[in-house]
Amino acid sequence: WRNCLRCGAPVAGIWCSAGQNMTHTVWFLTLPGVMALDLTGPAETLQLAGDRFSLRYIGPQPEVVCSTGMTIGGIEPLPEQLPAGSLLVVPGVYDSQICYATPQAAEARDWLRRQNAALCAQTFMLVCVCSGALLAAQAGMLDDVLCTTHHDVITRLKAAAPRARGQENR
């Protein structure tokens, strides 16, 4: 938490109530094996909020097959950097041991590493859903961050990010 530069209110990261008329861009990192619910749940919720959010889907390839076998297309290439004020959502995958061992996951992990400086500078916010926290941990994004994940991968999260403050049963 910090104070908003415009209104002085305490805010998480970069968003504040003074920017209610702003459209916030939300970027969903979309990899092969993405959990359908982890992607569509947050996306649908934000879509229902109206024009306050612009949803973008990014990843190493333009089309992936998700956990339900459905093909998701229209995925944009990974941008060099996220614009200031963005929200990055890293959804989980159906089997992180398999899905995060792919060339696409390696490319996404490298891209996430390149975003670390901007994340530390709080120019964008990071939200991980379920095992998406493991990918962020592998990219070094969770050092000194209070975090949790699905109980099946919490041990791997703690191993991938020993400096993260991983918590169980949250």
How would you name each of these model-derived features?
Residues 126-127, 147:
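A short beta-strand/loop micro-motif in the catalytic core of glycosyltransferases
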Residues 142-170:
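A conserved active-site-flanking secondary-structure segment within enzyme catalytic domains
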Residues 1-4, 169:
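Low-complexity basic/metal-binding stretches
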Residues 4-126, 135-138, 165:
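Extended, subdomain-level signal for the structured scaffold at the beginning of enzyme domains
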